């Protein structure tokens, strides 16, 4: 029995590792995915940034390694060139994007905390992709409002990734749907929100999970009803919903 208890304790420890946002019920299966498919193919700069971010006190905010790999593949499949990222943190998903884009690709990156971005910036610079990034410190909504005032910005983005304040996801969608091109893709992160989207309202959950839960539910409902997009919700990381603009 002691051996089984130790195994269970070890499994719990693995489930809490940095960047582990998988909704898989089996930690062993998630580790298999990481060790078989993700880590062996993870570019060295991304590995370096992942390990650097692991030392940060807010490391659970980072994009998981399997989601980073997924984003990289997606960007290459849609041949993205002009992209946007709302919510950067230390830049793991930003680096995945920058590495996936062609040399003349561009990323407009926005975050309210430049200090976190600067933690990962030396790694991004060493990877030789910093020239693709236009980082703006501050809230994204005012920047988006200015952008949509200029019709020349409409329909110019191939891909937009949102991993920021969940209470503004609806507000972001209202704006960026005008900026992404028809046939382009928007990715919303955390749309399964720690699995809380199917939990009873009185279920025990962390305060931040409970606070943002209704905003995530509101977003999911709105995306499902939006006739301008096709959607696909995937259980990658903490849930990511892809929206392909069709009109």
From Swiss-Prot:
UniProt-listed Enzyme Commission number(s): 2.1.1.104
Residues that bind substrate: 21, 163, 194
Record GO terms (molecular function): caffeoyl-CoA O-methyltransferase activity; metal ion binding; S-adenosylmethionine-dependent methyltransferase activity
Domain of life: Eukaryota
UniProt cofactor(s): Mg(2+)
Biological role: Methylates caffeoyl-CoA to feruloyl-CoA and 5-hydroxyferuloyl-CoA to sinapoyl-CoA. Plays a role in the synthesis of feruloylated polysaccharides. Involved in the reinforcement of the plant cell wall. Also involved in the responding to wounding or pathogen challenge by the increased formation of cell wall-bound ferulic acid polymers. Methylates almost exclusively caffeoyl-CoA.
The protein, known as: Caffeoyl-CoA O-methyltransferase 6
Species whose genome carries this gene: Nicotiana tabacum (Common tobacco)
